[in-house]
Amino acid sequence: MSQPTVNGSALIPLPYAPNWENGINLSYTFETAQFVSEQSTEQRRPLQSRERRIMEVDYLLDGTEAQQMMYDLAHGKDKVFGVPIYPETLIVSGFGYQLLSVVNALDYWNLNNYADYIFLFEPVSRLYETVELSGLGDTVIVAEYILQESFTANKTYVYPLFFGYLTTEPVLEPYTDQLYTVSLTFAEYLDGG
């Protein structure tokens, strides 16, 4: 699978919890080209190696978080984002040497088939880390390297990750006098673009 090279700060993380009330729309597109032969028969051919993931997500953030997110989005408008696939949330029940204990990891399509990276996020302490995936079992996720952060068991979420780019301008709207909603749409990079 062809993926962008991730080095240092090239990947912009999204360490924010989604607004589950509005739902998360994860869809798939597959681009093809139609060819017509001299006998007027039609044939479709794929223009990409597999389907492209598109994710529409809303975040409900306080003023400081909304300001930080808008700064990250302005900085990263033409860069690669690490987009967590929120519908495939797993809770980490324990940590070991490059191991994360989870339940039913093999039940998640994106984690099993397309994930090269995972995103760990502990909302209370705001810790997060992007980790390359080395192996996967039903009750364990193996990271390529030792985790840099000290996460807490049963308070840390792990998501499969895809590399994406913003397809529309971020929409920032007031929700209350202290909360804001930020609406984003990401498309996956495939085969270099």
Where are the predicted features?
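Extracellular/virion structural assembly segments
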Residues: 1-138, 142-193
